[in-house]
């Protein structure tokens, strides 16, 4: 038990270290998207920029306004990073004695709870801008959570298991992305909306003057929100690899491609209007997810009947 805790602690430590250099990679890529160089002054080729950013954020003073609900405002970012760390338990315990047979259900439960932290952080700031941003983010996450659950259930029909390891076993020779390319495209759209990334960053509005639900945050609390968001991006990249690209020898290559794709989307696409975002969630993504759920079930049923009729008798 103690050894498991030590291994998990090392995993979280490596994730937090990876987040630092992932932000550096994003800033470099965005710089080249804008035909300029990214951070290149701190250390050799800017490699020490994440360390300098961390020192700057954690050394700043946290401004506490008298109208804030201080306890909830402090606890909300801590809930965000705690949910992010709990999601990484899926990948650690998958290759361990504490294997989660219901890892898909565990992921859906944790991702649903994480949306409450956005609502609490916006409400506790007692600012109308942060409150509107938290309302938008909460409604967006709820809308796309349903489609995400439908996609995961439709994929879980194929290996007949809610364990992510079972997806790797059925993809040893042939990845599911070739058979389920439409579901993969819908999954990427849904994931970007869940992560509040461009072009669906309505909760935050990274390129605007008012930065959404986290406008009143600074110092170490802002750094914690920042780390939880980028930790979720890395976790979703691993999850997408498990679901669609399960070739064991190329795990780091595919995960890096997915992370780079999310960065390039931020540097390429513009933000959608909020009404278009909601209309796409309920009128386009959700009906298609339900159709794919029924198609997966009937395809699996017909394959089983074919095998039983031709080979079992």
Swiss-Prot record:
According to its UniProt record, the EC number is: 7.1.1.2
Q: Which enzyme type, at the first EC level?
A: translocase
GO CC annotation: what is one? Answer: mitochondrial inner membrane
Q: Alphabetically list the UniProt keywords.
A: Electron transport, Membrane, Mitochondrion, Mitochondrion inner membrane, NAD, Respiratory chain, Translocase, Transmembrane, Transmembrane helix, Transport, Ubiquinone
Q: Which family does it belong to?
A: Belongs to the complex I subunit 1 family.
Which PANTHER family does the annotation name?
NADH DEHYDROGENASE SUBUNIT 1, NADH-UBIQUINONE OXIDOREDUCTASE CHAIN 1
Q: What does this protein do?
A: Core subunit of the mitochondrial membrane respiratory chain NADH dehydrogenase (Complex I) that is believed to belong to the minimal assembly required for catalysis. Complex I functions in the transfer of electrons from NADH to the respiratory chain. The immediate electron acceptor for the enzyme is believed to be ubiquinone.
Name-wise, this protein is NADH-ubiquinone oxidoreductase chain 1
List the taxonomic lineage: Eukaryota, Metazoa, Ecdysozoa, Arthropoda, Chelicerata
């Amino acid at each position: 038990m103690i050894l498991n805790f030590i291994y998990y602690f090392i995993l979280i430590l490596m994730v937090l270290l990876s987040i630092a250099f992932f932000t550096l990679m994003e800033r470099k890529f965005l710089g080249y998207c804008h035909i300029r160089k990214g951070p290149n002054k701190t250390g050799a080729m800017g490699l020490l920029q994440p360390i300098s950013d961390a020192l700057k954020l954690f050394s700043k003073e946290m401004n506490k306004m008298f109208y804030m609900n201080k306890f909830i405002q402090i606890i909300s970012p801590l809930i965000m990073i705690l949910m992010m760390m709990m999601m990484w338990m899926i990948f650690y315990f998958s290759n361990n004695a504490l294997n989660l047979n219901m890892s898909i259900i565990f992921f859906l439960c944790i991702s649903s709870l994480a949306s409450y932290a956005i609502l609490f952080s916006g409400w506790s700031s007692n600012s109308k801008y942060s409150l509107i941003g938290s309302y938008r983010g909460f409604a967006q996450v709820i809308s796309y959570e349903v489609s995400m659950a439908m996609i995961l259930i439709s994929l879980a029909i194929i290996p007949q298991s809610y364990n992510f390891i079972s997806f790797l076993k059925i993809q040893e020779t042939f990845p599911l992305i070739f058979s389920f390319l439409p579901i993969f495209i819908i999954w990427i759209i849904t994931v970007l909306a869940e992560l509040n990334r461009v072009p669906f960053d309505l909760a935050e509005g990274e390129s605007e003057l008012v930065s959404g639900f986290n406008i009143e945050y600074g110092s170490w609390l802002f750094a914690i929100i920042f780390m939880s968001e980028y930790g979720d991006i890395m976790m979703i990249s691993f999850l997408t690899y498990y679901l669609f690209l399960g070739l064991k020898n190329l795990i780091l290559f595919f995960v890096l491609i997915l992370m780079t794709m999310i960065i390039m989307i931020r540097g390429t696409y513009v933000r959608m209007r909020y009404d278009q975002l909601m209309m796409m969630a309920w009128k386009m993504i959700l009906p298609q997810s339900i159709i794919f759920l029924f198609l997966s079930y009937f395809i699996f049923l017909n394959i089983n009947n074919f095998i039983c009729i031709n080979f079992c008798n």
